[in-house]
């Protein structure tokens, strides 16, 4: 059953089928190399993140997203340079890292999260929200007092939520979703992508808000109505949800042969 509020099921079905073909090619390419470049692991992680968001939007059962989530986190851990200093954030895209870790929390990818957390700790990456979420699977993980981007009002609201009692935290997340999340300043290039041609739109899911709700065991009934809140990813598939294959079906030939629209990222057509 379609979960997205801005595009129809056909859009996501075709987009995920195309992306599946691309990801299969990337995986085969990685396996064929004795020592792939770290950027190649990033490309795979980026594509898997896009797939998870679009597949969730389409209505694919949550349980079928666990395997690609683990694969995404493992690939991302391999893209981090072990000898680099990431104390200032390095070259990692913060919003993407926070979203991936949030997916891992929601989909219970414990071992993959622990592995990524160890890699981030080794390179000196320190951020309050990232560490707060990683402590869900590794309670002794160091929790720094500050955000990497303390001037960001949306991130400050999330931090405020984590320091509040449960009732206040739920209200903080409600305010975040309704006033701070879907803004051009917060989403940047992803803002308004549902109006653009091609398949740039992945879904506007705030995985971080649901992950915080899970870690804090919040009553999120009030958040369920937000078009940005991935309720099912936290609570699981509704009763009666049919089984789905772990991987989506391959794209039909007609999709493989269509001319590509101008790309925003490597996996967009």
Per-region residue spans from a language model:
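Eukaryote-skewed repeat-based solenoidal scaffolds used as protein-protein interaction platforms
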Residues: 1-195, 201
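Alpha-helical oligomerization segments
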Residues: 171, 178-269
């Amino acid at each position: 059953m379609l979960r997205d509020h801005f595009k129809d099921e056909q859009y996501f079905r075709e987009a995920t089928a195309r992306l599946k073909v691309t990801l299969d090619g990337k995986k085969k390419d990685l396996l064929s190399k004795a020592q792939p470049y770290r950027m190649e692991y990033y490309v795979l992680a980026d594509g898997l993140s896009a797939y998870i968001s679009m597949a969730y939007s389409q209505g694919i059962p949550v349980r079928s997203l666990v395997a690609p989530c683990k694969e995404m986190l493992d690939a991302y851990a391999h893209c981090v340079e072990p000898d680099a200093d990431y104390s200032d954030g390095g070259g990692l895209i913060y919003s993407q890292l926070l979203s991936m870790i949030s997916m891992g929390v929601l989909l219970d990818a414990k071992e993959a999260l622990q592995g990524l957390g160890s890699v981030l700790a080794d390179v000196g990456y320190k951020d309050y929200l990232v560490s707060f979420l990683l402590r869900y699977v590794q309670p002794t993980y160091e929790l720094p007092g500050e955000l990497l981007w303390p001037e960001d009002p949306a991130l400050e609201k999330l931090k405020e939520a984590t320091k509040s009692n449960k009732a206040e935290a739920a209200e903080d997340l409600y305010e975040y979703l309704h006033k701070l999340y879907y803004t051009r300043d917060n989403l940047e290039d992803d803002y308004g992508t549902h109006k653009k041609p091609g398949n740039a739109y992945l879904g506007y899911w705030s995985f971080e808000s649901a992950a915080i709700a899970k870690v804090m065991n919040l009553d999120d009934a009030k958040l369920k109505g937000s078009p940005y809140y991935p309720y099912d990813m936290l609570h699981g598939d509704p009763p009666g949800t049919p089984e789905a294959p772990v991987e989506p079906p391959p794209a039909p030939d007609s999709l493989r042969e269509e001319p590509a629209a101008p790309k925003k990222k490597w996996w967009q057509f």
